Amino acid sequence: MATKKKVNVTINGVQVQVPEDYTVLLAAREAGIDIPTLCYLKDINEVAACRLCVCEAEVNGKPMRNLPTSCVLKVEDGMVVRTDTERVRKAVKMNLELILANHNRECLTCTRNQTCELQKLCHEMGIDMEWFDGETRSVCYDDLSPAIVRDSTKCVLCGRCVSACAKLQNISVLEFVNRGVNTKVAPGFGYSIKDTDCIYCGQCINVCPVAAIKEKSHIKQVWDAIQDPKKHVVVQTAPAVRAALGEEFGVTMGKAVTGKMVSALKRLGFDKVFDTNFSADLTIMEEGYEFINRVKNKGTLPMITSCSPGWIRYCEVFYPEFIPNLSTCKSPQQMFGAVAKSYYAKKEGINPKNIVCVSVMPCTAKKAECARPEMQVDGHRDVDYVLTTRELAKMINEARIMFDKLPEADPDPIMGEYTGAGVIFGATGGVMEAALRTVADVLTGKDLKDVDYEAVRGIDFFKQASVTLPIGGKDVEVKVGVVSSIAAAEKVLNAIAAGELQLHFLEVMACPGGCVHGGGQPHVSAKNRLDK
């Protein structure tokens, strides 16, 4: 790969050498200079909408007209940039104050209090008064969908959600509607989110800098169930939750806090605390046997995983011809709920109608999944309520539990035991690897060696591999693929339909990188997202 040409740029008196395709914003960060942004997301939303990243710039000794935005201004050799002048500071503060003039300022009770990027910028820029007042945009509060809530009074028109939905997922549920003071971000034609093709993945929530889009909270319902003496409340936690929950309490990003999480759940009042890995193992076993049966009996191939509810909804809406390819397995969340209200209820002598099953998931689409009409038996919902990782953190804080002081605890027995296979479900490729290991063990009685995946040129977030397994009395080269993000999945499905890609088994995760980047995980600022 050819080395990119470097250019010399001076920013606030600091000389830095960067690739010629860099923007001034990226060059400034290389030089250790933080330029404020609200709308910017690298490679996703580079539209200069907020105008908080303005600067003064000179090229060949000639000042550029007006104040260009550094997020889209390309560097040039010898360019001189200033972001610390009085003119720039005044412009940034005024633009920030204009954004605030059209913003709902209920910061103390807002769900994004202390994680709001707008709030942080106001603090950093010393905004302590409201200088502008006037006509504001019309109010739209949409809480009709089972998973996502929109609040237009908090929208800053940054466009991040529009770009994420279009570029990461290629669905484009959200768009800019109307003009001038009436401009808003919303589904077209005045539709509610629930009346669109939204898959409830929550990537729009992940990128929103404020609280204009958030998950539909189940916190009150869960508290009510815990306080009801007639209800036996059980909770399951997904693998990706333990790796992210600690971030809400100052723990290093990515560090697992399994023991403290279990301890916190018990203190919250849940009667039993279980691990979704238990049902993940069940899913792996069922999926593995189903795959063997399909290959032996010339069933529909490639078999495609059914763990990701966002992916399932996408398939149903956009690619119904692939529905026969989907595994017949319920997701681990729903499988756990079904087992909890049958096997567990019988084992413990509890009437299923008195069991409330709560899930803690990294995923907003799980809220929509548990509400699907078919996810019940004899009138009993498999899963009653779903909490995101963020919601669990709020409950822990509300209960005044000091997370860092908690002792380590283990999940309850009966459905608290599991193998290591389910643990890797949270990362892309985890479901596939676990299922293949099960298939290999069933067919050969031996452990499968590491699966060596190779990236596929032209499709981001997609990799494939091949494994030789004895199926139906002969060695079969099983071709498998792993894809995350709906935009990438669409390319893979099109390649399969066109006969350009032959696979036996395909894992699809709706969120880029898998469940660890789900729509219910702790908020990460755009700057930290870039750094990580």
What is each stretch, according to the model?
Residues 2, 7-8, 15-88, 92, ...:
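Iron-sulfur-associated redox domains of electron-transfer enzymes in respiratory
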Residues 51-200, 206, 213-228, 232:
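Fe-S ferredoxin-like electron-transfer domains
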Residues 12-14, 151:
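Extended, non-catalytic structural segments that build the interaction scaffolds
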